[in-house]
UniProtKB/Swiss-Prot annotation:
Recorded superkingdom: Archaea
UniProt entry keywords in alphabetical sequence: 4Fe-4S, Iron, Iron-sulfur, Metal-binding, Oxidoreductase
Originating organism: Methanothermobacter marburgensis (strain ATCC BAA-927 / DSM 2133 / JCM 14651 / NBRC 100331 / OCM 82 / Marburg) (Methanobacterium thermoautotrophicum)
Classification lineage: Archaea, Methanobacteriati, Methanobacteriota, Methanomada group, Methanobacteria
SUPFAM superfamilies in alphabetical order: Thiamin diphosphate-binding fold (THDP-binding)
Composition skew (Basic and acidic residues), residue ranges: 149-159
Thermoactivity: Optimum temperature is 80 degrees Celsius.
Protein name, as recorded: Pyruvate synthase subunit PorB
Gene name linked to the record: porB
Chain spans, region Disordered: 137-159
Keyword Iron: yes
Binding site for [4Fe-4S] cluster: C16, C19, C44, C208
Cofactor note: Binds 1 [4Fe-4S] cluster per subunit.
Catalytic activity: 2 oxidized [2Fe-2S]-[ferredoxin] + pyruvate + CoA = 2 reduced [2Fe-2S]-[ferredoxin] + acetyl-CoA + CO2 + H(+)
Length: 288
């Protein structure tokens, strides 16, 4: 795939060095192009790209509350359709907190109503903007400020909420997982989401140097390691048909992924083995 050179998210924003969210937005907008309206919930992306009166967005962009990105996007889509502008792409960007927790109700409603929108969850696996608090998307064992490791807790003790399958259960015509570290896979999924009639949901895994604890130069490497260990699986569900879009030639031990991040360094060998066992069971089910 030839990646277009034109940018719709300008440089000079205030993202952390190594920020994965901005990489994802840049790639998505290269596919969607100028004829696009973006909606962003409160979160990292909004804070770093639009400190008043500045903006990094080169397309129409709307900032909304933490919980209603999908609701506003659905309203924008209906308004454009009423004005005879149904060809305009409407995309919502929200973090895992604004998707799996606070915004789940409005997202569910928008998907169920069948609005022709694309919803992209940029998942850094915690509320990074407000201080690295755990979310429903925080993986088992990770240490956050609200699920810390210590005498009374070893870190997050709940499994990661499976948002893609929840969206698939709504009958959404196109659901996919993606990673910023596999740009061609992600961009092809954005293209499919754009071209399909009806709602589309993409769950984008994006390493966070600040919240995960790794060198900013390792963002892409960490994203690849998540996929190569089976900790994050790339797939799509198109009209109910499930398909894995990338299979590692030989899966690496999950320990390589865990050891590369500060948020997992407290885990014992026994706890790491438990996580490996879980990953193995999921991968075996999907024949990865």
């Amino acid at each position: 795939m030839k990646i277009p050179e034109e940018e719709f998210l300008a440089p000079g924003h205030r993202g952390c060095a190594g920020c994965g969210a901005t990489v994802g937005v840049r790639l998505a907008l290269k596919v969607l192009g100028k004829n696009t309206v973006a909606v962003s919930s409160t979160g990292c992306l909004e804070v770093i790209t639009t400190p008043y009166p500045e903006t990094a967005w080169e397309i129409p962009w709307i900032h909304v509350a933490f919980e209603n990105a999908a609701a506003v996007a659905s309203g924008v889509e209906r308004a454009l359709r009423a004005r005879g502008r149904g060809e305009v792409n409407v995309v919502a960007f929200a973090g895992d907190g604004g998707t799996a927790d606070i915004g789940l109700q409005s997202l569910s409603g928008a998907m169920e109503r069948g609005h022709n929108i694309i919803y992209i969850c940029y998942d850094n696996e915690a509320y990074m903007n407000t201080g690295i608090q755990r979310s429903a998307s925080t993986p088992y064992g990770a240490s956050t400020t609200t699920s810390p490791h210590g005498k009374e807790s070893f870190g997050e003790d709940r499994p990661k909420k499976n948002m893609p399958l929840i969206m698939a259960a709504h009958g959404v015509p196109y659901v996919a997982t993606a990673s910023i570290s596999y740009p061609e896979d992600f961009m092809e999924k954005v293209r499919k989401a754009r071209d399909i009639e009806g709602p589309a949901y993409i769950h984008l895994h994006q390493p966070c140097t600040t919240g995960w604890g790794f060198d900013p130069s390792k963002t892409v490497e960490l994203g690849r390691l998540a996929v190569e260990t089976g900790s994050w699986i790339l797939y799509e569900i198109e009209d109910g048909d499930f398909r894995v879009t990338y299979r590692p030639v030989q899966r690496k031990p999950v320990e390589e992924y865990l050891n590369a991040q500060k948020r997992f360094r407290h885990l014992t060998e026994e706890q790491k083995a438990k996580i490996q066992e879980y990953v193995d069971s999921v991968c075996q089910e999907l024949r990865i």
